[in-house]
């Protein structure tokens, strides 16, 4: 064998050993998560980038065939904004929430259940007939309560915006028991008038569902690497944090990060063993988070 051929053989051997080490590292996590429910909140740039959407679908299918029971909850902010602009409907944000008139809500429902949900289901089902769409309105899955917001010390009316106040996971459990991957859109009937639906935050909806399902983990995809103690100092990235530490840190966080970290806190406080925010811009970040020891992003654990 020539020197060049020997070098190539050595490289192949090293690559094979590296792959084997990665597979063995995943063994303990495969054991831990076997037949366990993992709730994944899909959002951010991953929703509008075709390649990231494709790799997300691959990850979800991988989880399913690896013996986990994944549940996807999605928002649709970018798509909703695009559709409102296309239809010439004015929309504004107050206190970080989209003011939702009845006209806006019809667009929200149309985009979430008729566009985003279908796109996610189609991406997953490219690998087999596995995914099924479920709306938060279906079979009493979510019940919401209207909320306002405080802006500059003044309470403002957000319209048809609410918080999830109760979850009946029966419809989702039925899909899981049938071997399917539920894809859940974040909209909820109003508890005071079930004929009226509310636009609810998808991060909070995912957390509430994770608690109701007794999930092993909540994973929220974001557009940042994780939680920073002192943004924009990239050296302040937090790999893991206890719930009590996060609770104290929460008021000082950037406004865009607060709902996501609050959702992680709600999940852990509700009995979910771990919750994490990860960078959805990195292909296959979900697999790195679940099946490697160091994970990726920021993990929240009980105090």
From Swiss-Prot:
Binding, substrate: 76-77, 98, 199
Enzyme Commission no: 2.7.2.8
GO cellular component: cytoplasm
CDD domains, alphabetized: AAK_NAGK-C
InterPro entries: AceGlu_kinase-like_sf, AcgluKinase_fam, ArgB, Asp/Glu/Uridylate_kinase, Glu/AcGlu_kinase, NAGK-C
Pathway: Amino-acid biosynthesis; L-arginine biosynthesis; N(2)-acetyl-L-ornithine from L-glutamate: step 2/4
UniProt site positions, description: Transition state stabilizer: 41, 260
Highest taxon of the lineage: Bacteria
UniProt-annotated location(s): Cytoplasm
Catalytic activity: N-acetyl-L-glutamate + ATP = N-acetyl-L-glutamyl 5-phosphate + ADP
Enzyme class per UniProt: transferase
Annotated keywords: Amino-acid biosynthesis, Arginine biosynthesis, ATP-binding, Cytoplasm, Kinase, Nucleotide-binding, Transferase
GO biological process: arginine biosynthetic process via ornithine; L-arginine biosynthetic process
GO molecular function: acetylglutamate kinase activity; ATP binding
HAMAP family linked to this entry: ArgB
Recorded family membership: Belongs to the acetylglutamate kinase family. ArgB subfamily.
Record NCBIfam families: argB (TIGR00761)
Record's function text: Catalyzes the ATP-dependent phosphorylation of N-acetyl-L-glutamate.
Annotated protein name in UniProt: Acetylglutamate kinase
Organism: Clavibacter sepedonicus (Clavibacter michiganensis subsp. sepedonicus)
């Amino acid at each position: 064998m020539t020197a060049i051929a020997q070098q190539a053989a050595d490289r192949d051997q090293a690559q094979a050993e590296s792959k084997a080490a990665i597979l063995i590292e995943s063994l303990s996590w495969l054991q831990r998560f076997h037949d366990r429910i993992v709730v994944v909140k899909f959002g951010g740039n991953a929703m509008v980038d075709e390649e990231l959407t494709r790799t997300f679908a691959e990850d979800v299918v991988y989880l399913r065939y690896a013996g986990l029971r994944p549940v996807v909850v999605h928002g649709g902010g970018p798509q909703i904004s695009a559709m409102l602009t296309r239809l010439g409907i004015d929309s504004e944000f107050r206190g970080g929430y989209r003011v939702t008139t009845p006209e806006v809500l019809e667009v929200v429902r149309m985009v979430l259940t008729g566009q985003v949900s279908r796109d996610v289901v189609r991406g997953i089902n490219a690998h087999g007939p596995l995914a099924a769409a479920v709306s938060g309105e279906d079979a009493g899955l979510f019940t919401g309560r209207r909320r306002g917001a405080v802006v500059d010390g003044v309470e403002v009316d957000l319209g048809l915006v609410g918080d999830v106040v109760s979850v009946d996971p029966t419809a989702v459990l039925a899909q899981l028991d049938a071997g399917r991957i539920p894809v859940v859109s974040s909209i909820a009937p109003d508890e005071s008038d079930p004929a009226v639906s509310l636009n609810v935050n998808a991060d909070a909806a995912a957390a509430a569902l994770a608690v109701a399902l007794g999930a092993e983990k909540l994973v929220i995809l974001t557009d940042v690497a994780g939680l920073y103690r002192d943004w924009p100092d990239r050296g302040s990235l937090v790999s893991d944090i206890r719930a009590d530490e996060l609770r104290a840190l929460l008021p000082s966080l950037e406004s865009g990060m607060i709902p996501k970290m609050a959702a992680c806190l709600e999940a852990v406080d509700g009995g979910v063993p771990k919750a994490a925010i990860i960078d959805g811009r990195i292909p296959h970040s979900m697999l790195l988070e679940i099946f490697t020891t160091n994970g990726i992003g920021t993990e929240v654990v009980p105090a």
